[in-house]
């Protein structure tokens, strides 16, 4: 769905950014018939700033992050939410590396973002992560409230499982063209 993916790979969300980059380099098109632009930044803060700028230009834009990366995105998240800009940040949730330097899955990172104004949508399996990513995208366009779509880092982000992929036609049916046009017109 998205036209721009601003990335700075951080474990356990690296796989999402790497796959987006791989698909773009292979010329795989989104539902609009375009190859999404993948912009790899020097930091998570840079990725969030790129998301903000791209959204302000009217592009459908996303990013993928986890733990400390999400913390560095918070200042831009306040701006994005305050401007009622549609966006989805996909977060492979894990503990923040503090005194214990833990990489175990928990929701410390996501809970630290509660006050940004982003809505939160959680997925508990690979299938749910696939399905809820689209629901978050469709809902952010309708509500003009940005979303954090999160799931357990490592347990879900690295799980290998068979899922039922949504077809481009199904995805297209979920995205309202008028809402996309309205998003673009606000730029």
Task: Give residue spans per PLM region.
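Intrinsic-disorder/low-complexity, polar/charged segments
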Residues: 32, 43, 125-126, 187
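Conformationally flexible catalytic loops at phosphate/diphosphate-handling active centers
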Residues: 32, 36, 147-187
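Arginine residue identity/basic-tract feature
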Residues: 79, 94, 114, 142-144, ...
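Thiamine diphosphate
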Residues: 1-112, 117, 134, 153-154
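Conserved thiamine diphosphate
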Residues: 103-153, 165, 177-180
């Amino acid at each position: 769905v998205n036209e721009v993916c601003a990335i700075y790979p951080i474990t356990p969300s690296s796989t999402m950014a790497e796959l987006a980059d791989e698909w773009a380099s292979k010329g795989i098109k989104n539902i609009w018939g375009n190859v999404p632009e993948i912009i790899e930044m020097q930091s998570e803060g840079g990725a969030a700033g790129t998301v903000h700028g791209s959204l302000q230009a009217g592009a459908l834009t996303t990013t993928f992050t986890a733990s400390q990366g999400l913390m560095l995105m918070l200042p831009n998240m306040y701006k994005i939410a305050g401007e009622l800009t549609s966006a989805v940040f996909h977060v492979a949730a894990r503990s923040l590396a503090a005194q214990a330097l833990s990489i175990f899955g928990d929701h410390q990172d996501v809970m630290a973002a509660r006050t940004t104004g982003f809505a939160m949508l959680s997925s508990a399996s690979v299938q749910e992560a696939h399905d809820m990513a689209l629901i978050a995208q469709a809902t952010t366009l309708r509500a003009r409230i940005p979303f954090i779509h999160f799931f357990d880092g490592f347990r879900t982000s690295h799980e290998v499982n068979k899922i039922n992929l949504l077809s481009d036609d199904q995805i297209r049916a979920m995205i309202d063209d008028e809402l996309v046009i309205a998003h673009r017109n606000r730029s």
